[in-house]
């Protein structure tokens, strides 16, 4: 399992090698029924559970993709992770989530 952290280091470990920058990207379409529900909540207030679930799913997939790519590079961890969100498409019907960080090899401190 590849460790993932937003910090520049992993507590209790020493970074022994920097493998390079690694990304995981997911582009997801938004369902029209979720759009309808979200539009009503925008007018009347409240949270859009459909959008929140889609956002969480896309974020988890982007992190998992980043972990797979880091593992393919021979890394043990990804440090300095940042997650970005972007709305795409003429009708803003697509969501892009990007996870990025530095793939590193680590060893436990003595």
Curated annotation (Swiss-Prot):
Pfam families: YbjQ_1. InterPro entries: UPF0145_dom_sf, UPF0145_YbjQ-like. It comes from the Bacteria. Belongs to the UPF0145 family. NCBIfam families: PRK01119.1 (NF002224). This is UPF0145 protein Blon_0093/BLIJ_0092. It comes from Bifidobacterium longum subsp. infantis (strain ATCC 15697 / DSM 20088 / JCM 1222 / NCTC 11817 / S12).
